[in-house]
Amino acid sequence: MTRMRDLVERRPFMLGFAGFAVFPASVRAELEPFKVFKSPTCGCCSKWVKYMRENGFIIRTKDVSDEQLMKIKNMLRIPLKHRSCHTGIIGNYWVEGHVPASDLKKLLASRPDARGLAVPNMPIGSPGMEMGSRKDPFDALLVLKNNRARIFTRHNIIR
């Protein structure tokens, strides 16, 4: 996965003093820094990054053009049907779209043999896509090495 590492950059990641005050060391220690590629004009992407930071993730963002973002998604071989508005890379996984922090923490704790997590289609009520009290059901998908996906977590399911 050298290409992923090259995208993330090998420089050390820093978390500001405020982050250390908010998140206990035990939480910070289990989280890896990651890089998020997004459009500079996408408000929902910025809201998702803010949400992830509030949940303890150390994120470096890189604003890129739509063309550059498509090249990154193609290089990572993210299936078209699972694509969304922003792409992150953490360790050997990619994170596509409005994936909840709890799902990413679960992925990092379990370390499945997979390529990444995806929440396609920007569902209303997913992190960064809040619209009042409306919360549409959505699935976070685990995309396996063969590009097949299975449901990793279901969200906003009415029972």
Feature roles, as predicted:
Residues 1-8, 16-22:
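N-terminal secretory signal peptides
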Residues 25-29:
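Sec/Tat signal peptide C-region and signal peptidase I cleavage site
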Residues 32-47:
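Local sequence-structure signature of Cys/Sec-based thiol-disulfide redox active-site neighborhoods
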Residues 33-34, 58, 92-94:
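Short active-site oxyanion
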Residues 48, 65-68, 100-104:
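Stable alpha-helical elements in mature extracytoplasmic
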Residues 51-60:
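Conserved helix-turn-beta segment immediately C-terminal to the redox Cys motif
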Residues 59-70, 90:
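Thiol-based oxidoreductase modules, predominantly thioredoxin-like and allied folds used
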Residues 74-159:
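Thiol/selenol-based redox catalytic cores and closely related redox-interacting motifs
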